[in-house]
């Protein structure tokens, strides 16, 4: 039995995690893959959100248009960007996009968010975006405050250092109540990402090297959350073929196969898809 199947029997959910580059830089292709994944028993389909990537990647698809296509091609799987760098987005636009996509999908959206990085092709510096990590962290937190308020359906009055929303009501609301689940990405051993993660519905640790690292982060987040705590998700990205069972035992609730963006191909993704989670 594969490690993937063992983990699924332990209760770990599995989602395709598609870098929308080159072979996958086509919303029709991504939507077909999502439909195949749903038919094969996968629990989610998430996509990378970038405007460019370093060589040899040449083609990049828009994450949000692709997610709309995925929503139309599926009925059951969770879907969303994993992750979208909120600091390079306008929060009021994201408020409209998330509510619309959640309604389009019948309440299946999960919003993955993070700081973003300039290391993978200069997509921040080459487009005039903020490159200071500290400032992007502030913009991320402020954007999340605006989104949470917008999803409530009440008028939003926000006057912050980076954004202003002066008495706007964002209707219709998302299908999910009280709003779209948010998973925040960050380094597992850093204090600020863990505190941010504890305020929302899930954590997506990056650059994990072993399961013990994850266990420490899970314990830290648990200590920061209110009690009794509502359900919480921990998602891990691991290379295809890696046994995710130790990570499930450390607290992971979702496993995402992490494809190499420089070499990912449609055939490789379909191969992983066909090896999908075992039936419980």
Residue locations for each model-derived region?
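Active-site-adjacent structural elements that line small-molecule/cofactor binding pockets in enzymes
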Residues: 1-280
